[in-house]
């Protein structure tokens, strides 16, 4: 079913990279004013194509359904402080959230009830539902500014285990048994969830400036890092594979309108706020503070398609379970702190129907 009233077909491209224009986004579903403050996270249900949750700095998590192309708010639950992250349980029956009240909360879709199941001593920046240990037990892992990650059994209030991190946790992601944690001071901790309490490998981001986001490959053999300096790095767990296939590249940079004609003046550099991998094709998207998003093919090392600058930064983006829908927020990303925000700053969630032209790897002829 296509709720965007257009087919998901493949069309040929004359080159390996293409720039879109605003007409390519004309059929996007737009949710205006989805929250009273900036959107911090978006997560799709792993069991439904058109249902997702969005957390916000206004202290709420809202659940949306766009099954028929008309956005409908299905539920919301509140916190006393900004909510920084949200994710769904693997069976799609519960939505977890964490934020600046330091609490891990679990919302039950069927009952509409919210329970607090855990606490940190500082804000929870990121969380994931993972399967741990030899028995692949489902639990929640949270990463906090208190320099720890904690594993939680949803049936008890105390963490199953706590792992110290070298610094405050800024980002975290997992695929299969791979968990990658990115912290302040550019530290990267790699954990094999078969042995979840041990850091399998500790390394440092090759990017020179603060890490903004991390995302794992579908194959669970590596991860991508985005930084505040408008760079992305493609990394592999295996040292030999890293030497062969790892690389870094510039992105989310704009021409400085004030530079002199014909000069080689500096570009305007924006943070890479969010990275997401297509669940079927393994290509990926970066979204940035410049208000653009780009689809990339890491294996062929080229951009599949770039999009025009929109009216606000993009703090977060996400694919649905089969990659047919790409959601992104236009919202303040807090990169410039409190002083950079303003009352009239846009606050929008948009849903874009992907085409193979945009997101599928193009084989070499």
UniProtKB/Swiss-Prot annotation:
Protein name, entry field: mRNA export factor GLE2
Pfam families per UniProt: WD40
GO BP annotation list: nuclear pore localization; nucleocytoplasmic transport; poly(A)+ mRNA export from nucleus; post-transcriptional tethering of RNA polymerase II gene DNA at nuclear periphery; protein transport; regulation of mRNA export from nucleus in response to heat stress; RNA export from nucleus; septin cytoskeleton organization
GO cellular component: a single term: nuclear membrane
SMART domains: WD40 (SM00320)
Similarity comment: family membership: Belongs to the WD repeat rae1 family.
Coiled coil: none
Membrane-topology annotation of the record: Peripheral membrane protein
Entry keyword annotation includes Repeat: yes
SUPFAM superfamilies: WD40 repeat-like
Keyword Transmembrane helix attached: no
A molecular function GO annotation: ubiquitin binding
Organism: Saccharomyces cerevisiae (strain ATCC 204508 / S288c)
Subunit structure: Component of the nuclear pore complex (NPC). NPC constitutes the exclusive means of nucleocytoplasmic transport. NPCs allow the passive diffusion of ions and small molecules and the active, nuclear transport receptor-mediated bidirectional transport of macromolecules such as proteins, RNAs, ribonucleoparticles (RNPs), and ribosomal subunits across the nuclear envelope. Due to its 8-fold rotational symmetry, all subunits are present with 8 copies or multiples thereof. GLE2 interacts with the NUP82 subcomplex via NUP116. It also interacts with NUP42.
Membrane-crossing segments per the record: none
Highest taxon listed in the record's lineage: Eukaryota
């Amino acid at each position: 079913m296509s709720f965007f009233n257009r087919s998901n077909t493949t069309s040929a491209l004359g080159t390996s990279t293409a720039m879109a224009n605003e007409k390519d986004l004309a059929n996007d579903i737009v949710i205006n004013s989805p929250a009273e403050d900036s959107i911090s996270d978006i997560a799709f249900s792993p069991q439904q194509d058109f249902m997702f949750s969005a957390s916000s700095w206004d202290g709420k998590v809202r659940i949306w359904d766009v099954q028929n192309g008309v956005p409908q708010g299905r539920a919301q639950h509140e916190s006393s402080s900004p909510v920084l992250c949200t994710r769904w349980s693997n069976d799609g029956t519960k939505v977890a959230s964490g934020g600046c009240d330091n609490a891990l909360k679990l919302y039950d879709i069927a009952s509409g009830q919210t329970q607090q199941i855990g606490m940190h001593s500082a804000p929870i920046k990121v969380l994931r539902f993972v399967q741990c240990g030899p028995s692949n037990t489902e639990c929640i892992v949270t990463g906090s500014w208190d320099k720890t990650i904690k594993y939680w059994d949803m049936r008890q209030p105390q963490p199953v285990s706590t792992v110290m991190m070298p610094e405050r946790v800024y980002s975290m992601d997992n695929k299969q048994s791979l968990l990658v944690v990115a912290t302040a001071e550019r530290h990267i901790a790699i954990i094999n969830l078969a042995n979840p309490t041990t850091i399998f490998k500790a390394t440092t981001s090759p990017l020179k400036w603060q890490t903004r986001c991390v995302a794992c490959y579908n194959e669970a053999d590596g991860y991508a890092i985005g930084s505040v300096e408008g760079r992305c790095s493609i990394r592999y767990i295996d040292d030999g594979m890293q030497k062969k296939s790892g690389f870094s590249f510039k992105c989310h940079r704009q021409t400085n309108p004030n530079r002199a004609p014909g000069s080689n003046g500096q570009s305007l550099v924006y943070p890479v706020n969010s990275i997401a991998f297509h669940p079927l094709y393994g290509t990926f998207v970066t979204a940035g503070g410049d208000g653009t998003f780009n689809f990339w093919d890491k294996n062929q090392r080229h951009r599949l398609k770039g999009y025009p600058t929109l009216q606000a930064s993009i703090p977060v983006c996400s694919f649905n379970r089969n990659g047919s829908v790409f959601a992104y927020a236009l919202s303040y990303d807090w990169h410039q702190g409190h002083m950079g925000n303003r009352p009239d700053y846009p606050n929008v969630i948009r849903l874009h129907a992907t085409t193979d032209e945009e997101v599928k790897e193009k084989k070499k002829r």
